[in-house]
């Protein structure tokens, strides 16, 4: 294995991820001493969330900000907000509402935030671009950008000091 990941500062600069020069958890190959960040995943629309999993959160998953706060209390290093409500075939929530929610989570938890879309590539790019433009007091991790669709979103992310996760089917 001869690849490596770059180090990136997330949040307000006080969290650093990456920098590995070997496979995860192989300390004899990987001289990077940063431990992996543990993420707590939050959905903004739990309509399709598994019922059995909802039970674990004691009703706190009904409010995404409260759910993110719970993850912080449990020791999560980063919050991953999955914007399921923006799906055009379901709730079709606005990009502004999504950006407001991300900002509320950032403000309430003071943790780095990874933002994921609903899986509809066109809608994800539209909404995540607005999120990049409106959330400015932290460095977001935008998840994920596919090869043929990255230019607009990458431009918005870079212009606002956010980072993106590239995705490539092998």
Show where each model-derived region lies:
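N-terminal amphipathic alpha-helix/helix-capping segment at the start of soluble metabolic enzymes
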Residues: 1-58, 66
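Active-site mouth loops of central-metabolism enzymes
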Residues: 38-66, 90-93, 117-121, 143-144, ...
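Glycine-rich, proline-tolerant flexible connector loops at the mouths of alpha/beta enzymes
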Residues: 50-52, 75-104, 109, 115-121
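Catalytic domains of carbohydrate-active enzymes, especially glycoside hydrolases
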Residues: 59-84
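Conserved, mostly hydrophobic/aromatic
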Residues: 71, 105, 131
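Catalytic beta/alpha-barrel core
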Residues: 80-82, 91, 112-120, 137-150, ...
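Active-site-adjacent beta->alpha loops and helix N-cap segments on the catalytic face
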Residues: 88-101, 120-128, 145-157, 170
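Short, surface-exposed basic-aromatic patches at helix termini and helix-loop junctions that form
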Residues: 132-137, 155-159
